[in-house]
């Protein structure tokens, strides 16, 4: 069977770049997990949008008298975390549910957990982090009310992102443990090298059952030289 053509990210045909990944929820993700995986994908999009809003808020912060370094860091976070969050925690989640891969589940938990901690820090809004969180927004009301109101928007969005991330970790962990996942299975996948490109569940089933039955039933043949009916 020919390999599936990559379709993500969708790029205009005039660009010399081509999509890097194949992504189709209905084709690769089991029906019972499609809703959850789609929600994780929407969470990634929501977080990227939050980084974009944060960039605008940091610009308002800078114009109103804040440090320009915050705007520079906000731009860096947007450019860096948009692709990296997709590759580092959404794709492991996608592959984990696609192939029931313990290694990819472990990768998701580790990196997504770090992402959750970072998002909480961004929601708090420590000075010099390039994030318009609560501390930065509330503390700037004495300088510029208009800019502070704009800065409250990413603070709210970062808080919502962190909340949804916490709920997502709990849900995915329950499914993983309920299916019998463990660190030992992840180590086995690492040793066998199947973590690189784990086959889908359908491919695993076909590999298991493909030779168990012939494609067509075997029909017994009888010699024509035997006796005849009277």
UniProtKB/Swiss-Prot annotation:
Entry's transmembrane regions: 40-60, 61-81, 106-126, 149-169
Cytoplasmic side: 1-39, 170-230
Coiled coil regions, renumbered to chain: none
Subcellular location: Membrane
Predominant location category: membrane
UniProt keyword list: Membrane, Phosphoprotein, Protein transport, Transmembrane, Transmembrane helix, Transport
GO-annotated biological processes: protein transport
Record flagged with keyword Nucleotide-binding: no
Topological type in the membrane: Multi-pass membrane protein
Any GO CC annotation of this UniProt entry: membrane
Pfam families in the record: SCAMP
Residue numbers of Phosphothreonine PTMs: 194
Protein's UniProt keywords contain Zinc-finger: no
Family recorded in the similarity comment: Belongs to the SCAMP family.
PANTHER family per UniProt: SECRETORY CARRIER-ASSOCIATED MEMBRANE PROTEIN 4, SECRETORY CARRIER-ASSOCIATED MEMBRANE PROTEIN SCAMP
Stated role: Probably involved in membrane protein trafficking.
Protein name from the UniProt record: Secretory carrier-associated membrane protein 4
Organism for this UniProt entry: Mus musculus
Gene from which this protein is expressed: Scamp4
